[in-house]
Amino acid sequence: FCFSGQKPQEIWAAVKSMRGMSLAGAVALGLFFVCMEGTIIRILLGAAGGKSGLLTCISYSFLGFFYSGITPSATGGQPMQLYEMKRDGNSVSSSTVVLMVTAVCYKLVLVCIGAFLLIFQGEMLRQYLGGYFGLYLLGLFLNLAITLVVTGMIVLPQWIIVGANAFDRLFVKLHLWKASGSVGRQEKVRCFVQEYHRAVLFLKEHPGRLAAAFLLTFVQRNSAFVITW
């Protein structure tokens, strides 16, 4: 996907034109970015009683970025991470909470950085982005909206039950699911939400780890900005 439609000679010429130290630094920062997410997953998973070690959690991060890169709209990353975490003996509910908190931290950092630039460097942004400044505001708004929705799902797991029941009724009407299995499916959702809520409460008892996850996410996000420099 990276090299589709590109000429290998031009790519190689661009790579050779780079300074060795700059190229090595960019590669190191790229690896740091991915490994940092694995570290954050380990910190949160440990608080939720997960079994996976640091290297295994880093492998979840690499797996997530890989499948995000090859699936439409980057939708395949977290499902594959959840699958691997479950296969390694971690509970689905705890793993789901960990991945959602990781996503919230990532989005929240983007919102904070975007809002900071808008407040203190708004004129520079307008001059630099020109006609694309509206897209910047749209992106900031969408990231904020997603952050609020996911945070709501973490704090108010009842939303999951309401949403799952709504989708269940919709799929039954579309004849994608059998109506006879609705009771069983709803019971599974309720059991999942109970475990999910216990994992959320457990994380709330470890505010230090949540703060560490946010700070590490801030460092991780800014390391990506340094790569382009």
Annotate each language-model stretch with its function:
Residues G38-F62:
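Membrane-embedded helical hairpins/re-entrant loop segments and their flanking transmembrane helices
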Residues K107-V111, F192, T217-T228:
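Core segments of transmembrane alpha-helices
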Residues A26-F33, G64-T71, Y106, L216-Q220:
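Alpha-helical transmembrane segments of multi-pass integral membrane proteins
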Residues F32-T39, L44-G46, S68-P79:
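Short helix-coil transition sites and intra-membrane helix breaks within transmembrane domains
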Residues L176-Y196:
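Short, membrane-interfacial amphipathic segments enriched in basic
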Residues S17-A26, L201-L216:
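Membrane-interface helix starts
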Residues F1-A13, G64-W177:
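Transmembrane helix-loop-helix hairpins in multi-pass inner-membrane proteins
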